[in-house]
Amino acid sequence: MAPKAFFVCLPWVLPRHALIVRQAGNPYHFLAYTNPRAPGKLQDSHCPVFFMGIIIITIITVTLAIIIINIIFLTLFDDGMCFYCSLLTFSFVSFNFDHFDHFDL
């Protein structure tokens, strides 16, 4: 198994001793971890690795949501970006001061 496997270490995502193993001819990636009692041996956790796909899908979804929200606010309000930024930073005071000219005082 070891000569046919391709190992990629992801220490920032996976816990200690964890590796992603891809066997030759196998399209699926499986999570395996090194056995501290037997160095060089891999112990399969029998768990397909879906978390990388979930992370990528989450990043794409959040990015698209931010773009869509920006487009909506820019089309509904004349200075939509300022309004959207004030929503993000919760600086409603500066938003209100900037928009006094819209009201008849």
Curated annotation (Swiss-Prot):
Residue ranges, Cytoplasmic side: 70
UniProt keyword Zinc-finger present: no
Topology of this chain in the membrane: Multi-pass membrane protein
Extracellular face of the membrane: 1-48, 92-105
Keyword Transmembrane helix set for record: yes
Main location: membrane
Location of this chain's protein in the cell: Membrane
Residues passing through the membrane, by range: 49-69, 71-91
Keywords: Membrane, Transmembrane, Transmembrane helix
Recorded GO CC terms: membrane
Something else known: Present with 521 molecules/cell in log phase SD medium.
Protein name (Swiss-Prot/TrEMBL): Uncharacterized membrane protein YIL054W
Natural source organism: Saccharomyces cerevisiae (strain ATCC 204508 / S288c)
